[in-house]
């Protein structure tokens, strides 16, 4: 790798290909001054070698102006002063699967002033800040995250490096885009996509809460991003309103806000190695968004992100968190119980289907929690439902019937009205096998296929055979439900 110190090792001039003079100014015989930003390397999408660049200060100029070292006069620049050469050594930290992100190593950050015009501060932390910047050559706006590695400490720097590695490896319309990285011995600069509308949390605070349709669009985008990450075995682990940025927004004809969101801040994100069953153990995240299994310090998987999506959706709909308490200890107790309430009057205008989605997202047991992919296919999210959603599995139907038997009685009344008086009076007894509700011809047909197949008396459809789960409901493929004795 080329030495970044011009005084110690000669390099080739990008203009004339001759060796530069061995002096502090690093001036070539063709009178071109070389930049202190002498080595630029590209993080690769595979394990192949990287590319090194030697960059002159004229590589980027505002409106194409450059300065001659000897005359001091400005002269137009017509070409990019970059020389590429192969390298056997790769400076990147790992192999990536999505596009190339330049990772530029410098002696100091002064060279950035040649590339960007810095503007307002967008955010500030204990050891870094985010600044709006304009690329002088392309006249494009970016958000540059500047981190002081010395103040951050080794542990925080490791998290930052992991964040950079993950951002280099992803490409999705609803995940923040990393354009390039500049790094000095003391600082790191992440040039990222600028989201001019700010944090989703700020917009929520101004609105109070979002409508159901507005929330649906946000959750669609969020679910798409998380499904993409989970498919790549990446777990975000810190999903919250503050970590969802808004690139742009508009008000549609129905006076509803449409937001183009971007998931950001991958400081706690981790890429799992191995099969999807691999579990995580580190307790991390923001308390009100943390899943029960994370609080319990149990092994957990990417399903912790799904719980966080549920919390976000709940807050978007009503403006308040699902669980609130006077102390963190009490808050964690509420989260571990996972009892959702919809007592606020706002919930009167929210569909039962949306509430059902919330319940599926916030199952205390992660094994029963809906996945990101399943969420994308959910009828409420796709907009393919016009009525209240009903549970899709036997266990959920059992719970619904126990909590609200009146609703089930209403649904079965219509079914009984369509049957004969004799069929209305039938009482079905629970059994590990499907109750005998078919005639002899049905039984003979079942014997032919070697199992106890039955037929629905309502629509003559096939009934799922030999269910191993003791239940109060039987589900037919025609979506008819028959209540049996408890």
Curated annotation (Swiss-Prot):
Residues 39-100, 402-451 are annotated as: Disordered. GO terms for biological process: mitotic DNA damage checkpoint signaling. Its EC number is 2.7.11.1. Residues 57-66, 413-426 have a biased composition (Basic and acidic residues). ATP binds at residues 122-130, 145. Residues 41-53, 68-80, 428-440 have a biased composition (Polar residues). GO terms for cellular component: nucleus; perinuclear region of cytoplasm. Autophosphorylated. The keyword Transport does not apply. The modification Phosphoserine is found at residue 407. The active site is at 238 (proton acceptor). It is found in: Cytoplasm, Perinuclear region. Keywords: ATP-binding, Cytoplasm, Kinase, Nucleotide-binding, Phosphoprotein, Serine/threonine-protein kinase, Transferase. It is an enzyme of class 2 (transferase). Interacts with vimentin/VIM. Belongs to the protein kinase superfamily. CAMK Ser/Thr protein kinase family. CaMK subfamily. Serine/threonine protein kinase which phosphorylates vimentin/VIM. Therefore may play a specific role in the dynamic behavior of the intermediate filament cytoskeleton. This is Serine/threonine-protein kinase 33.
